[in-house]
Every structure is written in structure tokens, then in C-alpha cells.
């Protein structure tokens, strides 16, 4: 299995795929102290996103979501990588600000929802340039 994402922020990562089945807002939907999904209406409520390759077919939310991403990076509990169905400037901004503050940089890729659906439930490896493969 090999796929090519569109690079929004380049980097390398490895982590278990976590495909969110519904959109979520990081502001109010993700606990920045634990990385767990806290929105009680979300079907994956309670799941931790730390260290995962987080696939988000669609986003919902607030411009404050970038601050939550920044907190996750600062605490070392951010996802290993982000895969957006469509480019998302808000969460990407959190990663960019984190980079400027010296926090670890995670890769951020755009990968169509139809392509995300084809990803196997396994540990994925993201290479520089956006190559996605099973680890």
C-alpha cells in the first residue's frame, strides 16, 4: 500500500491510523491536557489522538483550534501526523507556530476523503514529500 498526500507541512512520522468518523472542533472537542476527544456527542468520545496519524475527512470548528494544537505539541501529546480531506489553515497554523516556538514539527498532508477511506487500519509511515505507506 502506498499513497501520495499533498504536503501542507513537510515532515516524517509513524503512528497508528486513527480515522475520525465525524468532524470535530479541537476547541472544546479535544482535551489539551490528555489529547482525548471530549465532545460527548462525538462517536469516538474518550479516544486519545496522541501519537496517531489522525485522518480528518472534514473539519468543524473554531479559529481557537490552533491554540489547542499548539498545547498538544507543547505537551508532547500531539498526533504524529495530520491527514486532512481538504486543507485546513487553522490546525496547520498551530503546527507552524509550534515550529517557530521550537516544538516538534508534525507532517500535515491533504489526502482526499475517498483516499483516506482506502487506508488500512495499521501503523502508517509518512515520509518527506508526502509519501504514505504501511510501516
For every predicted segment, state its role.
Residues 1-17:
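Catalytic or ion-coupling anion/metal-binding cores of large enzyme and transporter domains
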Residues 7-9, 19-128:
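Feature captures the catalytic cores and cofactor-binding loops of soluble hydro-lyases/lyases
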Residues 129-135:
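Phosphate/diphosphate-binding glycine-rich loops and adjacent basic-rich segments that engage nucleotide
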Amino acid at each position: 500500500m502506498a499513497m501520495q498526500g499533498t504536503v501542507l507541512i513537510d515532515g516524517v512520522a509513524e503512528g497508528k491510523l486513527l480515522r475520525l468518523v465525524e468532524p470535530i472542533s479541537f476547541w472544546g472537542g479535544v482535551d489539551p491536557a490528555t489529547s482525548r476527544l471530549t465532545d460527548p456527542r462525538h462517536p469516538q468520545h474518550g479516544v486519545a489522538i496522541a501519537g496517531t496519524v489522525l485522518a480528518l475527512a472534514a473539519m468543524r470548528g473554531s479559529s481557537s483550534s490552533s491554540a489547542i494544537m499548539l498545547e498538544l505539541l507543547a505537551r508532547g501529546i500531539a498526533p504524529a501526523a495530520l491527514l486532512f480531506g481538504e486543507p485546513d489553515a487553522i490546525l496547520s497554523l498551530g503546527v507552524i507556530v509550534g515550529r517557530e516556538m521550537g516544538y516538534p514539527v508534525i507532517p500535515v498532508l491533504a489526502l482526499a476523503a475517498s483516499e483516506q477511506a482506502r487506508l488500512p487500519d495499521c501503523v502508517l509511515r509518512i515520509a518527506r514529500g508526502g509519501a504514505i505507506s504501511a510501516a
